[in-house]
Amino acid sequence: MSATQAKFSFGNVVLVSKLVDGKFPDYGRVIPQNQPKKLKLDRIALLQALQRAAILTSDKFRGVRWVLGDGSLKISCNNTEQEEAQEELDVPYKGEALDIGFNVGYLVDVLNNLDVAEVECGLGDANSSALFTLPERSDFKYVVMPMRI
């Protein structure tokens, strides 16, 4: 064993691995800070709306558009066959409107794997990442990069 290796023992099994050279990236720099637009969203309602919209996204381009306005979040998508899906959720939001796109798969993945009633979403502008957090768990953060739609 050397300083460039890691050793793991599980009963009669021993695993030795070479450590990666270099410095671990500063992941804290990609977590958005001070996002002015805050939403509290019903996880199940949002998940179901996204799943319905995802049916009409193309396999290659999985984009959904969120249009946030006073009291509503409109979710829409379309595909190459000119089919379109639109959903609207009531949200407790008052403020500046926002039009932003996301890969629906990333949103569905996080919402599918949570066991909570409500999620919080922090948004900046159309080019800024979204930050999903949980009201009762300060250790949970999920960052979703926007995409152009």
Pin down the residues of each PLM region.
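Short hinge/gating elements
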Residues: 30-34
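DNA polymerase processivity clamps
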Residues: 1-20, 35-149
